[in-house]
Amino acid sequence: MDTVGQIIRIKRESKGLLLRQVAAHLDIDQAILSKIERNERKPTKENIIKISEILNLDKDELMVQFMSDKIAYEIADEDCANRVLKIAEKKVKYLKAHSVKN
């Protein structure tokens, strides 16, 4: 299963773009983009939006990958990770139904 970093790298390479070219459009150092692609650093939400535009990726799908990576990395080492996800899903449904904002 590809991470958001792998998705970005695969798409960038398929378009024949260099790290420095994409990094320049993002206004970040190419070393940072390289770390994002290698999953050594997490992109910001703003980076995800810009990357989707630069690489012509579906913004919503890339955002789903970004958010799911964040959650997965946060709870992966927990013994109760699956239970946490099930309860979190119920909480999200509740919050959406009751229009609760954080």
Name each model feature, range by range.
Residues 1-14:
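A short, Lys/Arg-rich alpha-helix, primarily the initiator
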Residues 8, 19, 30, 45-48:
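Helix-turn-helix DNA-binding elements, focusing on the entry/boundary residues of the two helices
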Residues 27, 44-61:
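DNA major-groove recognition helix of helix-turn-helix/homeodomain DNA-binding modules
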Residues 63-102:
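Short, charged recognition helix plus adjacent turn
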